[in-house]
């Protein structure tokens, strides 16, 4: 029996992640709701970490070597509105890259599972 494709595969695999992350951060860094969180961030390193994390989270190969989400976001006082902004920017990025609303929804559903850890709740 053939296994169902992962969200990572449905998105287009590593090439899609590699295309999406820079565009995603362009949107995030222009978003007044969240851009201040990245003021003193090495964005090259952040983008690599994000690409690896999203790849792993969405069902691709696990090359993520960063902190867990609770530790990575500890002390940032993130609120639901901040998490929502990130999801919205990612959805807009994927839409711009031609991903269907259905697959964007599938990705958002998987990412939603990290909300509590990211918000420290």
Swiss-Prot record:
Binds 1 heme group per subunit. CDD domains: TrHb1_N. Keywords: Acetylation, Heme, Iron, Metal-binding, Oxygen transport, Transport. The modification N-acetylmethionine is found at residue 1. Pfam families: Bac_globin. One of its GO terms (molecular function) is oxygen binding. It comes from the Eukaryota. Heme binds at residue 73. Its cofactor is heme. Monomer. Belongs to the truncated hemoglobin family. Group I subfamily. This is Group 1 truncated hemoglobin. It comes from Tetrahymena thermophila.
């Amino acid at each position: 029996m053939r296994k169902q494709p992962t969200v990572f595969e449905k998105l287009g695999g590593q090439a899609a992640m590699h295309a999406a992350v820079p565009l995603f951060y362009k949107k995030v860094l222009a978003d007044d709701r969240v851009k201040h969180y990245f003021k003193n961030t090495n964005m090259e390193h952040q983008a690599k970490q994000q690409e690896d994390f999203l790849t792993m989270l969405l069902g691709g190969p696990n090359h993520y070597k960063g902190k867990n989400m609770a530790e990575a976001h500890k002390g940032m006082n993130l609120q639901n509105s901040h998490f929502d902004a990130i999801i919205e920017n990612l959805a807009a990025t994927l839409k711009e890259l031609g991903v269907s609303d259905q697959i964007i929804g599938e990705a958002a559903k998987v990412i939603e599972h990290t909300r509590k850890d990211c918000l420290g709740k």
